[in-house]
Amino acid sequence: RIGDADSEQLAIVVNAGMALGEGELYGFITYSGRDNTSGAFYRNPAGSGAALDDGENVVVDGFLPLINSEIDDFSYNLGYRVDFDDNSAFDVSYTYGRNSIDYTTSNSANYSFANELNFGQGLTDAEIRAQIPREAFAYGIELGLQTINFDYTTSVGDIFLALGAELREDTYTITAGDEYSYRDYDTDEAGQGIYPQNASGGIQGFPGVSPSSAADESRNVISFYADAEYQVTDAFLLNGAIRYDDYDGFGDTTNFKLAGNLRVTDNFRLRGAASTGFRAPSMQQLYFSNISTQFIGGVQVETGTFRNDSQLARAIGIPELKEEESTNLSLGAVVDISDRWNIAVDFYKIEIDDRIVISNNLGFGLSDALDAALISAGASGGQFFLNAIDTETDGVDIVSTFGDINVLGGDMTVTFAANFTNTDITRIFSNSPALAPIPPEQIFGGFQPSVIETWQPEDRISLSGNWSRDNWTAHVALQRYGEYTTEDEGPQTYGAEILTDLRVSYEFDNGLSVFASGINIFDVVPDEVTNSSSRGGSFESAAGLEDMFSPTVFRYSRRSAPFGFNGAYWSVGATFSF
């Protein structure tokens, strides 16, 4: 099963507000529930390590494991805001949100349990095939946050001030799966096989998380900010801001911003900004761990994704995760060519230090200290989240708008937008004694650097038009995605493509609006993948004989597709306002 997952979704949004005293009480509730089903790789019956007495696999014809995910998003907000007569205002609010995903693997089997039933319990072939479970709960994850915000704005002379504070709690939980989903039944605690044949443990396709990888973590954050805007002269506007954040996990950080806007003439303005920034390690990067079956270089191995604060990470000498730090510079100009036509051009540079990435699978033979640590953890390889790279991004944004065009008796506005961006990794480092002898490209290499540098087009250009007449509106957009390159089993560059979107709507006087729209109406798809062996594949019988060969297992790259590979999408709909 190749392509998008089968999906069913329900979404509800409620907004409300009412006058209360001198201000407004407001709030919203959102809920989204989605059930997805996707396929893993097909398991052929040969070579499972779980052949029964009749010589056949426990699942005679093989199977396609299915990954089922139940996704729930829920959030609500309650706030109160007041605007005062002296041009000041305050807003206080509470927000809660959570996202949870429960994974179940179905149409699958834990091969090692077949060996347990066969050699450990002495069941017959028929009894084993009747009793082996084909489904298991793999694990659940939930990410949540709750915040209390206070914002106050006022004017002091010619200076506009904004002050604010926030209290936030982040939570993250991992719920262990059913024992059947993760357990290796035919291996002892020392990792040695206990039966005449040995099979992979855990349910095939999407193995579960054991209790040792379960998590229930939280952190608290307190933040303050101040923002000031000063009209220095009629032509020069100056803005400055400072923000302080204190995390109970890794400490505090202070960041700044300075921006200015200079009107050189009535039709020409210059603008620029300089700022520092940060991104704290996400809860997932800090606390996710799992031992699973992965394919490294086409070979199936047992490997682990270990927490950055795990015993193995400490044995290797991997430092605790810290925040990413950034420096941002921008300089631009706005030209009003006429009352109907303007052009804006902005250049920018973003440098990010200590960027967090997940390492390659680090196995035996790379360093003595790493070998010893892997042996102690009972793993053949390990991946870790590391502050391991620095990056530099340079780019330019161009936006031009031409409005008030008379077309078919209506008004039309045309917008041209272009973005040119290049990102380079300027440094790869490990900060670990055990990893120091290992070449950087083996710590973070292969296709992973290309994810940051080349997987997305360096240029995107769009030309769109918005037209309206009486109750009719129409929108058409041409979007050009530039070339991009992926690394799979070798580099492949995919050509530029132009996509066309169209939407037409009509609004009735009673609040009812109907629309018809098409996305990618000319059914454009990316170039087909040519350099990956995963493009083709064979299906074998239990005897190891080839039953069928398919040249197009993956027709399109499964690594990157900036505009997808589903082609045209059409829809009609209606909205009603009351």
Locate predicted features.
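Outer-membrane beta-barrel transmembrane domain signature of Gram-negative proteins
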Residues: 65-77, 83-87, 96, 105-237, ...
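Gram-negative outer-membrane beta-barrel transporters
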Residues: 163, 342-488
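C-terminal beta-signal and adjacent terminal beta-strands/loops
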Residues: 422-423, 478-485, 506-578
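Repeated loop/turn-to-beta-strand initiation elements of outer-membrane beta-barrel proteins
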Residues: 22-25, 87-90, 158-161, 235-238, ...
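Transmembrane beta-strands of outer-membrane beta-barrel pores
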Residues: 10, 20-22, 31-35, 84, ...
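Outer-membrane beta-barrel proteins
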Residues: 1-15, 56-77, 133-147, 215, ...
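Transmembrane beta-barrel wall of Gram-negative outer-membrane proteins
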Residues: 1-40, 44-61, 65-88, 95, ...
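Outer-membrane beta-barrel signature, preferentially recognizing the C-terminal barrel domain
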Residues: 7-9, 205, 209-221, 267, ...
